[in-house]
Amino acid sequence: MKKIFLSFAIGLCAFTGQSQNIKEILLYSQENMNGTARFRALSGAFGALGGDFSALNVNPAGSVVFSNNQVGFTISNYHNKNNTNYFGTSANETDNSLDINQLGGVYVFENEDKSSGWSKFAVALNYDNINNYDNSIFVAGTNSINSVADYFLSYANGIPLSVVSGNDFNYGDLFYNEQQAYLGYQSFIINPTDTNPGTTTYTSNVAPGGNYYQENSIVTSGYNGKLSFNGSAMYKDRLMVGVNLNAHFSDYRKSTSFFESNNNNTSTNYLVERVRFNNDLYTYGNGFSFQIGTIYKATKEFRLGLAYQSPTWMRYTDELSQSISAVSSNVNEELAADVVNPRLTMIYEPYRMRTPGKITASAAYVFGKTGLLSFDYGVKDYSNAAFTPDRDFRDQNDLVANVLGVSNEFRLGGEYKIKRVSLRAGYRYEESPF
């Protein structure tokens, strides 16, 4: 369950632009606790254990721990409940989805050359859904300060009237900030201070006085998947080494529908009474990363693990469509809605992102066939994330480097077997990168 507190209108609107920012870095860099049932029960503390498909995502040396060939998959139910509070008004939204979050197979074989110290090898192919984006949030409340008009004014001021007063046919030629100004002007939410085509200042056409009732519905869906091509080997039954070559693919959709209404107008002038603003964002991409890892059996019971996950080099494309409708009225009548729908999907230039790498150190103690205790410590420096090339995103990258920092992660897991019953428990703590 998530609790979300929002305190100003522009935050409520959650409008999306073609502006890469810290939010995107976190969206595509952070991972959910997904994987096999055993992996999740132990909170993912598998870096020194191996022998589990999802453990390959922590330490690629773990595939050689399998004693025989295996195929496995895991289906999970995702449940999100979001509670929101906006200017004292509470709301909640629940989302459930069912998805395959792990699918893989491993082939294990012994070395027929008995004189070699390399006694065992394994190759594996595994898919992990490292992040599920299915979620929904609903926010509602009365804003005593800001109107949606403030959003459009923030983009419009400085843009000539001649740019935003054209017809829909030139909408696709406008920059993002010009498109927002266009939508606000064409729906009569904002007006120019005069009719000169060179005018660059605008005013709100929404009645002043506050008490703006606002709703925002945000629905997201998609996944961040990783397909790992794995190879590992065991040396003298003590040292295990492995490598993953990972193909990444991401699919993210976000739809927002913002509504605002007021009854502030007490004059005969026509002012905006209601607004509905819809945004549909689709982001998709693919990329590459690699992992190397080792597990060492210090004794029959005690194991140590160390793994490195490289940065992920991704290439993304954003597609965005927007529409808006506004209803104006005075004390005597209400006009028909002014609807602005360019019926155009903007496909922006692809951009590249480098997510941060990660180092994981692990230790585990195995009590024969009775049980085990396992601990993982991971460190990830989010300040190393960046959009590339740097010359095009210098301001954004400077912000990432200055605002984000190191995030430490601790995972602890335990298992105890009673005949055919396994009792499992785990604990995971991950610091905020801020």
Across the structure, where does each feature detected by a protein language model lie?
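Outer-membrane beta-barrel porins/channels
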Residues: 20-34, 39, 108-434
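Alpha-helical transmembrane segments and their juxtamembrane interfaces
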Residues: 12-13, 69, 421
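Outer-membrane beta-barrel translocator/receptor signature
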Residues: 37, 49-58, 64-137, 142-143, ...
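Bacterial Sec-dependent N-terminal signal peptides
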Residues: 1-23
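Active-site-proximal flexible loops/turns
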Residues: 9, 66, 253
